[in-house]
Amino acid sequence: NMVEFLIQEKHYPSALMSNEITVEINQMKKRCDTIVYDVNCQPFVIIEYKAPEVPITQKVFDQIASYNLKLNVPILIVSNGLTHYCCRIDYAQRRYIFFKEIPDYSIFKQYKNEQ
């Protein structure tokens, strides 16, 4: 599963990961699949999972972006188990910068202060 992959292979700290977190957006309760927190317990990465038969489309990115309106994280990850997308948000330039693969957690630390 994706959470185990992130912990075992990409060194995401399990103690800083929470699953199925409720976020209120426009007075509606939504559920983030996984949020990874920084060492100060602030949301840092949002992860959205889809089933393998569900293609990763703009609609999926719109979904995770809506969660980010509330959480304001620098990193977004979307996966259907077969295809993974990971991007950092450049808030100054108002754009997404995609990684070729999901980076090791240690790489993300440099982006925390860019929000």
Predicted feature descriptions by range:
Residues 1-75, 82-115:
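A short, conserved, highly charged catalytic patch centered on acidic carboxylates
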